[in-house]
Amino acid sequence: MSQLKPQEIVRLGDIQMANHLPFVLFGGMNVLESKDLAFEIAETYVDICKRLEIPYVFKASFDKANRSSLHSFRGPGLEKGIEWLGEIKKHFNVPIITDVHEPYQAAPVAEVADIIQLPAFLSRQTDLVEAMAKTQAIINIKKAQFLSPREMNHILNKCLEAGNDKLILCERGTSFGYNNLVVDMLGFDTMKEMNVPVFFDVTHALQTPGGRADSAGGRRAQITTLARAGMATGLAGLFLEAHPDPEKAKCDGPCALRLSQLEPFLAQLKELDALVKGFKKLDTH
């Protein structure tokens, strides 16, 4: 077993991520559809987060490797995707988070991304976990839809034994029968007991996997309800995807917040986060 322990507060420049601190936003778009659209979305997030004083990290994927159909849009790929993300990082002076799907991608992605993300479906893949951990980048570990919150401790231990203690856990829903996900609110406390920052991916928790003929469906209309519920548990951060025209988004449009609603949505969550974290803790054991 590793002598390392996870960092309770994960630091990224001036950004501090911890369950007792003001929430951090991992926000952007699902997949890099085009360079122009990525810049448009990044600019909107950056401007709004500056106004609301929300610490911010831009998120987008360069490849969606688990699409329902062979013909579904996947993104620009590793080389071009890293290039675009690097340009966004430099232009807006904003940190970057993106996901890694295969071990060989970990090192080149970590040269640009400040946080590398372990996809939920791949979270038990030991070779991938080890390759990501060895980059020494911050790792955002998505909780698999088929794993309990407590089982995430095994993945944390893999990272620690590979020498990386800069770890984040991220809830994104649990499979509930066919074509449905639910969020166990008690699971947030279970993961927080592991002394790591815990985030909530409200976007993908709204999925109805396989809910359409050749793609996932979603429940955008319930995003405010679910986001409020999750953030009321007192979390380190929120993971969110938005799009100027979700009906035309090339991936997970039914789950994406309308970009025009981003500011009022985040303003409500900032107010709720401050309220919850201002409460005196009660020991109900």
UniProtKB/Swiss-Prot annotation:
UniProt subcellular location: Cytoplasm
Similarity comment text for this entry: Belongs to the KdsA family.
Organism: Acinetobacter baylyi (strain ATCC 33305 / BD413 / ADP1)
Keyword Cytoplasm attached: yes
Cellular component terms (Gene Ontology): cytoplasm
Originating gene: kdsA
Pathway(s) of this molecule: Carbohydrate biosynthesis; 3-deoxy-D-manno-octulosonate biosynthesis; 3-deoxy-D-manno-octulosonate from D-ribulose 5-phosphate: step 2/3; Bacterial outer membrane biogenesis; lipopolysaccharide biosynthesis
EC number: 2.5.1.55
Keyword Nucleus applies: no
Catalytic activities: D-arabinose 5-phosphate + phosphoenolpyruvate + H2O = 3-deoxy-alpha-D-manno-2-octulosonate-8-phosphate + phosphate
Main localization, broad class: cytoplasm
SUPFAM superfamilies: Aldolase
Designated name of the protein: 2-dehydro-3-deoxyphosphooctonate aldolase
GO biological process: keto-3-deoxy-D-manno-octulosonic acid biosynthetic process
Keywords assigned by UniProt, alphabetized: Cytoplasm, Lipopolysaccharide biosynthesis, Transferase
Gene Ontology MF annotations: 3-deoxy-8-phosphooctulonate synthase activity
InterPro entries associated with the record: Aldolase_TIM (IPR013785), DAHP1/KDSA (IPR006218), KDO8P_synthase (IPR006269)
Pfam families referenced in this protein's UniProt entry, alphabetically: DAHP_synth_1
Transmembrane segments: none
